[in-house]
Swiss-Prot record:
Family from the record: Belongs to the peptidase S1 family.
Presence of keyword Secreted: yes
Molecular function GO terms recorded: serine-type endopeptidase activity
The protein, known as: Complement factor D
GO biological process: complement activation, alternative pathway; protein maturation; proteolysis; response to bacterium
Gene designation: CFD
Site-annotated residues for Cleavage: R26, I27
EC number: 3.4.21.46
GO CC entries: extracellular space
Upper taxonomic lineage: Eukaryota, Metazoa, Chordata, Craniata, Vertebrata
Ranges where the Peptidase S1 domain occurs: 27-254
Transmembrane region(s): none
Active site (catalytic residues): H67, D115, S209
Length: 259
């Protein structure tokens, strides 16, 4: 049964059965992004409905969050590239089928660890000013605390469930892991494979899962889809550190190319 408290639910008909795909996460306290200024952004969709964010890392691969597959069931998984508005016609927009969906082998439904997903598009994306891959961090280093990083998405933008049609974004300062692991914050659960950003009324959340945390023009992290209270300063946003997964990402894409 669809949740009527304000969170968007996309009903997916599977024969006689009805499943619910909910958009994972939201941008709280942000603003509309400049049109097509983030040409790497992807909308991961099930039966034409946005459920997660993602970003283009090569002509044929999109990186997202493993938990996003929980919303797929037997629905049709696709990726929308070149979009600013989800509903309005735009010359750069194109919807791609997914040839392969590869979650990290150690990802689990009950944990945010290893929350990564690689999606191979059915064909190479048509690159242009509004569609471009994003560089991602390959060197194992820590982003200094206080660094302002950009996060964007199409998730709902308020606790009342209002959902934007156009891409939203905000800047968030990175929070050091020691502070993020304090008992009053995430109580030791943040590993070296994760990073945190402050979340005082400005936050990414489950609905923007899979989108990139971009610092200095490079994707340093991916929005996780773990359940938590969004916009609560005592529960900072958690992101999967890409530098910890270079071998896995390269390996998946190389194996697929060789197949």
């Amino acid at each position: 049964m669809a949740d009527r408290s304000g969170h968007l639910a996309a009903l997916i008909l599977l024969g006689a059965a009805v499943c619910v795909a909910q958009p994972r996460g939201r941008i709280l306290g942000g603003q509309e992004a400049k049109s097509h200024e983030r040409p790497y952004m992807a909308s991961v969709q099930v039966n034409g409905k946005h459920v997660c964010g993602g970003f283009l890392v090569s002509e044929q691969w999109v990186l997202s969050a493993a938990h996003c597959l929980e919303d797929v069931a037997e629905g049709k998984l696709q990726v929308l590239l070149g979009a600013h508005s989800l509903s309005q016609p735009e010359p750069s927009k194109r919807l791609y089928d997914v040839l392969r969906a590869v979650p990290h082998p150690d990802s689990q439904p009950d944990t945010i660890d290893h929350d990564l997903l690689l999606l191979k598009l059915s064909e190479k994306a048509e690159l242009g000013p509004a569609v471009q891959p994003l560089a991602w961090q390959r060197e194992d280093h820590e982003v200094p605390a206080g660094t302002l990083c950009d996060v964007a998405g199409w998730g709902v933008v308020s606790h009342t469930g209002r959902r934007p049609d156009r891409l939203q974004h905000l800047l968030l300062p990175v929070l050091d892991r020691t502070t993020c692991n304090l008992r009053t914050y995430h109580d030791g659960t943040i590993t070296e494979r994760m990073m945190c950003a402050e979340s005082n009324r400005r936050d990414s959340c489950k609905g923007d899962s899979g989108g990139p945390l971009v610092c200095g023009g490079v994707a340093e992290g991916v929005v996780t889809s773990g359940s938590r209270v969004c916009g609560n300063r005592k529960k900072p946003g958690i992101y999967t550190r890409l530098a910890s997964y270079v071998a896995w990402i390269d390996g998946v894409m190389a194996d697929s190319a060789a197949a």
